């Protein structure tokens, strides 16, 4: 069985679910909009530039999880899915998932965005295996802290390798689809790296290395 690995944000989605979640919270008046938006945008700019402090970012994004009851978070997320995520699910991305599924490949979404945000999205896309940044839980609610290695840059390789070892799998014949140079460590590990609507830095790298470049837009 070959693996088909997919980044989520700006790969299978026409946008960034993590950043969009923050924008949705601001629009709903659930956080201090001016302060939150400024920090959210600054972190996103750092991500695009490849210099994100992932632990600081996760502390920022998960703070609201730690101070909100689970039932309320689930209600908000259902609204977020309907209002924000559904319109940015890419039909060509779903077709690509279906193509790999029909070929008998094991589908995996591997994303830096936390599991609270991405779990329902992976379910919506019909992908059972999700490797994401983990949110610590205690007594049935989020603590607001990150648990385990953040699934970002080299952390994606660490988290994936652990999952491979636990499941007796390897990367022989594996594909990985991503839009971002932040995913270069994992792109270099697979048999078939594919740049999807890549950012300028990944496009240059893919062209230099002769990697396929595709668009799902």
UniProtKB/Swiss-Prot annotation:
GO molecular function: hydrolase activity; metal ion binding
Catalytic reaction annotation: L-histidinol phosphate + H2O = L-histidinol + phosphate
Cofactor(s) needed: Mg(2+)
Keyword Lipoprotein attributed: no
The enzyme's E.C. designation: 3.1.3.15
Null allele phenotype: Inactivation of the gene results in growth defects and incomplete auxotrophy of the mutant due to a deficiency in histidine synthesis. The growth defect of the mutant is rescued by expressing hisN from C.glutamicum.
Residues that, per the record, bind Mg(2+): 7, 9, 179
Function summary: Catalyzes the dephosphorylation of histidinol-phosphate to histidinol, the direct precursor of histidine.
Name recorded for this polypeptide: Histidinol-phosphatase
The species this protein was found in: Pseudomonas aeruginosa (strain ATCC 15692 / DSM 22644 / CIP 104116 / JCM 14847 / LMG 12228 / 1C / PRS 101 / PAO1)
């Amino acid at each position: 069985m070959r693996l088909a690995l997919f980044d989520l944000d700006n790969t299978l989605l026409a946008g960034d679910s993590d950043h969009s979640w923050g924008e949705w919270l601001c629009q709903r008046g659930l956080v201090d909009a001016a302060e939150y938006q400024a920090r959210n945008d600054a972190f996103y700019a750092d991500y695009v530039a490849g210099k994100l402090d992932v632990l600081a970012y996760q502390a920022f994004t998960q703070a609201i999880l730690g101070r909100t009851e689970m039932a309320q978070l689930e209600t908000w997320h259902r609204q977020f899915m309907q209002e924000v995520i559904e319109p940015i699910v890419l039909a060509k991305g779903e077709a690509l998932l279906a193509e790999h599924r029909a070929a008998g490949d094991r589908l995996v979404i591997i994303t830096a965005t936390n599991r609270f945000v991405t779990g329902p999205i992976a379910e919506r896309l019909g992908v059972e295996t999700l490797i994401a940044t983990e949110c610590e839980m205690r007594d049935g609610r989020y603590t607001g802290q990150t648990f385990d290695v953040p699934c970002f840059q080299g952390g994606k390789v660490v988290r994936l390798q652990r999952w491979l070892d636990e499941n007796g799998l390897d990367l022989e014949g594996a594909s990985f689809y991503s839009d971002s140079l932040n995913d270069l460590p994992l792109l270099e590990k697979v048999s078939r790296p594919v740049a999807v609507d890549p950012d300028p830095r990944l496009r240059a790298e893919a062209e230099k290395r002769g990697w396929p470049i595709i668009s799902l837009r």
